[in-house]
């Protein structure tokens, strides 16, 4: 799917249906979406056996079920497992002895809000750490730190989908965590006011009709939202307000003169993405981004270790959910260009299936994406693509135009942010978390011309030892005698 979203997590009661079973129209829309490659996860506070009693063929219509408000997870293999430890049986026994009408799940205890005081008193009496969660007129008693968000995380992990590639849809009090955990949170029209206020999108339709609306838009690739919780702060505007840009569903062009600070700004954006747990792949043609490899969850390949096959990079991202910096700086120019083109095409192809990496950052983009580049892989414009260049005029037309955001780096302290339909705004970049050294390997490992080499001298003059770059200089210095030093 050439769309950012690869999964939709849907609440059941009040969202997918108001009755015991979704309508035929809703089930048909779900089947069409799954046929287009979208995974559907049903996320409910219901006890699993009760859900299957009212909707016996539920497993045939979804890719996974999160039941008991995150406490139980199923998957397509037919397995059912607890995603949290069950509550002590002593609590259920005490509640039933107190006259509370109770239903026992694999993890949670379910009752109604009329018994909330009795439940709270029993929890206090036993000294338990648990939580009480309201769902309209229902009351659930759950282990601490168990929610629809925690259960969804496990279900998506089983499916190989990141929460950043998921839309969450709900209607009630226990859906707040579901919406917050997903890239975009959606409230159906009949949702409670608090959830409507918190949602990124509020649908025009209620429950099942709203679900049909969302699934249609996801398959078409027309979902458009900019959640404030998923933004990268790059600096400060002249008026003192933070300069933020969306962390997903956009394409970005970073341009500016050589030495102005383009790679610094691109690295600043990459750090922000990593802080928000997006998966990125940086094609580093000049060795500007080795410090990103020091971040947790980031792997560096290439450089002094030599290149790995492009499919190896794809596997690192797919199976380890790792971000990768591909250091091409020590390779010949034509090798860098050819490798970057091959890897970019392969990453985009695999991302259509998995959603990963969320972002591809191509530094020195004019090298692989010059005027002769066959730009079919860039049609339609990929979301999550950041091109960095000091020569935008020689980018192929498809790569040069149509970006959602442009960052014109005028100097290390001045960047102009431009978005379609908005006036350009100047901001001053933040400090980086990692050290930025421009063209690192060019100075540390690429040999200089003979006339520019370091020459070592002893008491009697030159001793025949030279160094063509900083790595050689360091080695020679360590081996030199005191008289040379």
What are these regions (language model features)?
Residues 2-4, 23, 149-229:
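Mg2+-dependent phosphoryl-transfer enzymes with acidic/Ser/Thr/Gly-rich catalytic loops
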Residues 88-181, 190:
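Conserved acidic, metal-coordinating active-site core of Asp-based
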């Amino acid at each position: 799917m050439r769309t950012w979203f690869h999964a939709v997590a849907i609440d059941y009661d009040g969202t997918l249906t108001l009755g015991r079973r979704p309508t035929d129209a809703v089930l048909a829309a779900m089947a069409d979406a799954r046929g287009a490659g979208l995974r559907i996860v049903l996320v409910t506070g219901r006890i699993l056996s009760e859900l299957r009693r009212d909707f016996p063929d539920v497993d045939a219509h979804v890719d996974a079920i999160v039941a008991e408000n995150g406490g139980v997870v199923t998957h397509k293999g037919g397995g059912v497992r607890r995603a949290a430890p069950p509550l002590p049986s002593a609590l259920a026994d005490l509640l039933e002895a107190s006259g509370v009408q109770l239903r026992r799940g694999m993890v949670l205890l379910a009752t109604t809000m009329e018994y909330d005081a009795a439940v709270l008193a029993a929890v206090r009496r036993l000294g338990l750490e648990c939580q009480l969660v309201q769902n309209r007129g229902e009351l659930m008693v759950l282990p601490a730190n168990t929610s629809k968000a925690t259960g969804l995380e496990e279900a998506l992990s089983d499916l190989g989908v990141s929460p950043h590639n998921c839309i969450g849809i709900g209607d009630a009090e226990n859906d707040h965590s579901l919406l917050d955990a997903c890239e975009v949170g959606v409230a159906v029209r009949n949702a409670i006011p608090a959830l409507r206020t918190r949602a990124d999108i509020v649908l025009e339709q209620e429950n099942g009709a709203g679900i049909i609306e969302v699934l249609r838009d996801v398959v078409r690739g027309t979902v458009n939202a900019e959640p404030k919780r998923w933004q990268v702060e790059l600096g400060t505007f002249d008026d003192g307000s933070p300069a933020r840009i969306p962390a997903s569903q956009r394409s970005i062009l970073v341009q500016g003169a050589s030495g102005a600070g383009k790679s610094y700004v691109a690295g600043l954006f990459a750090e922000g993405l990593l802080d928000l747990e997006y998966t990125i792949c940086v094609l580093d043609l000049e060795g500007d981004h080795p410090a990103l490899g020091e971040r947790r969850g980031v792997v560096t390949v290439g450089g002094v270790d030599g290149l790995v096959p492009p499919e190896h990079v794809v596997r690192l991202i797919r199976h380890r959910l790792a971000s990768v910096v591909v250091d091409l700086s020590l390779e010949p120019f034509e090798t860098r260009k050819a490798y970057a083109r091959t890897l970019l095409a392969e990453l985009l192809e695999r991302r259509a299936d998995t959603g990963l990496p969320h972002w591809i950052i191509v530094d020195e983009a004019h090298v692989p994406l010059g005027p002769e580049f066959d730009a079919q892989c860039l049609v339609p414009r990929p979301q999550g693509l950041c091109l960095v260049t000091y020569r935008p005029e020689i980018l192929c037309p498809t790569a040069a135009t149509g970006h959602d955001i442009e960052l014109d780096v005028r100097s290390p302290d001045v960047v102009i942010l431009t978005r379609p339909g908005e006036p350009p705004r100047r901001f001053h970049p933040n400090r980086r978390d990692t050290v930025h050294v421009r063209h690192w390997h060019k100075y540390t490992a690429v040999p200089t011309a003979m006339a520019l080499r370091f020459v070592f001298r002893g008491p009697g003059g030159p001793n025949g030892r030279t160094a063509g770059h900083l790595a050689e200089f360091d080695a020679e210095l360590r081996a030199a005698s005191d008289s040379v030093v």
